[in-house]
């Protein structure tokens, strides 16, 4: 079991501990549960889906990286496929506060970058901030997304985001988590190709500035993040954050990164290079390359 889970695991009910122990035994537990695993946990504990998601939140929150606030938030995004995806907030010392990742963004990106097609619900241990409510409104599940909070009845996103402004107001038809392929040819080595593939999946209807980041760890594992724009602009999630979300949730740490590649267009209206390289350097990675999409 990864050390970060030990404290939260010890506080779970005995029957949930017994059912989870073989799942969490792998140090690189992928911070997700398949539909089959969810069904097995429900049978072992007698909990329904909502109660099980709440019971698992401490494990999601244990994935948080909060050196600034020490305020850990966990989220679980429930995919329409039946898979549940953990998420947690992340802060980066030496970067800017704008680089911060919220737990809801983490769980949603985890699902999206894992190939999930849509979300049915999201469970969070604290009320989503306005930033996250706006981020969720970019999803193809839209205002119908169910939000579950401890001690409250479940409500749709529309109940938390009154008079919402979103992609439909800007006549955007392709939404976050819809399948997208911008068709750039995969060239270069495996890491460069992973970055280009991530750029091809970008959701960037507002700036038309595709970008993707791929991180290579010392053991050869590659994590890729795609750019995810938002109708309100500021809740946009950069591609580096997507890659860092996966790296963190899959049990890796920043010192494990040995090389990074950013793929973007040289003449794009928005450029990721400066922010990406600055944040990576703050995390200790200085081997950073840029591949131009053409």
From Swiss-Prot:
One of its GO terms (molecular function) is identical protein binding. The active site is at residue 104. It holds the Pfam family dCMP_cyt_deam_2. The keyword RNA-binding does not apply. It catalyses: cytidine + H2O + H(+) = uridine + NH4(+); 2'-deoxycytidine + H2O + H(+) = 2'-deoxyuridine + NH4(+). This enzyme scavenges exogenous and endogenous cytidine and 2'-deoxycytidine for UMP synthesis. This is Cytidine deaminase. It comes from Escherichia coli O157:H7.
């Amino acid at each position: 079991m990864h050390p970060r889970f030990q404290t939260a695991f010890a506080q779970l009910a005995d029957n949930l501990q017994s059912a989870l122990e073989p799942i969490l035994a792998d140090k690189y537990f992928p911070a997700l549960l398949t539909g089959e695993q969810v069904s097995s946990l429900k049978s072992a504990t007698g909990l329904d889906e909502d109660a099980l998601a709440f019971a698992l939140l401490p494990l999601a929150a244990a994935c948080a990286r909060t050196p600034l606030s020490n305020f850990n938030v966990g989220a679980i995004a429930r995919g329409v496929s039946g898979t549940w995806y953990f998420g947690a907030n992340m802060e980066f010392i030496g970067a800017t506060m704008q680089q911060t990742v919220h737990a809801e963004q983490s769980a949603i990106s985890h699902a999206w970058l894992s190939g999930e097609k849509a979300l049915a619900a999201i469970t969070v241990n604290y009320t989503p901030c306005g930033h996250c409510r706006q981020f969720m409104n970019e999803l193809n599940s839209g205002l119908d997304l169910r939000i579950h909070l401890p001690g409250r009845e479940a409500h749709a996103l529309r109940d938390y985001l009154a008079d919402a402004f979103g992609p439909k107001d800007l006549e955007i038809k392709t939404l976050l988590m819809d399948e997208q392929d911008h068709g750039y040819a995969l060239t270069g080595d495996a890491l460069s190709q992973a970055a280009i593939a991530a750029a091809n999946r970008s959701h960037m209807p507002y700036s038309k500035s595709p970008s993707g980041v791929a991180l290579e760890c010392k053991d050869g594992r590659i994590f890729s993040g795609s750019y995810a724009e938002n109708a309100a602009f500021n809740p946009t999630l950069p591609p580096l954050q997507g890659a860092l979300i996966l790296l963190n949730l899959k049990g890796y740490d920043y010192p494990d990164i040995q090389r990074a590649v950013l793929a973007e267009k040289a003449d794009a209206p928005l450029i990721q290079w400066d922010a990406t390289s600055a944040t990576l350097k703050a995390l200790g990675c200085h081997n950073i390359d840029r591949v131009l999409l053409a």
